[in-house]
Amino acid sequence: MGALRPWHIAVLVVVLILLFGAKRLPDAARSLGRSLRIIKAETKSLHDDDRDLAEKADAQAGYQPMPPQVQQGQHPQQSPYPAPPQQQPVVDPVQRTRDS
């Protein structure tokens, strides 16, 4: 049930021809194709703009791309950021007993 069969497609084509007419159907398909091309071009330009802005922000902040992987036998470079300080566990000076 739910599988699309060839006769389903044939019925769909007949309904489309009846609704839009044989003369308007190619024009509708052409305008739909143009719209899809425009949407594709706009989303690509938005994606490229986002990438350009990210690269510009990284350049302004002084970030550099990650260095290539360290080869065997070489020491890795130290991170330019200091390691976070080690936190010591908090000890409660007052301990409760069950008798109190």
Curated annotation (Swiss-Prot):
Any GO CC annotation of this UniProt entry: TAT protein transport complex
Keyword Transmembrane assigned to the entry: answer is yes
Query: Topology in the membrane?
Result: Single-pass membrane protein
Q: InterPro entries per the record?
A: TatA/B/E (IPR003369), TatA/E (IPR006312)
Q: Where is the composition biased (Low complexity)?
A: 69-78
Q: Name the residue ranges with Basic and acidic residues bias.
A: 46-58
Name the job this protein performs.
Part of the twin-arginine translocation (Tat) system that transports large folded proteins containing a characteristic twin-arginine motif in their signal peptide across membranes. TatA could form the protein-conducting channel of the Tat system.
Q: Which PANTHER family match?
A: SEC-INDEPENDENT PROTEIN TRANSLOCASE PROTEIN TATA
Its name, as the record gives it, is Sec-independent protein translocase protein TatA
Q: Which organism is it from?
A: Salinispora tropica (strain ATCC BAA-916 / DSM 44818 / JCM 13857 / NBRC 105044 / CNB-440)
The organism's taxonomy opens as: Bacteria, Bacillati, Actinomycetota, Actinomycetes, Micromonosporales
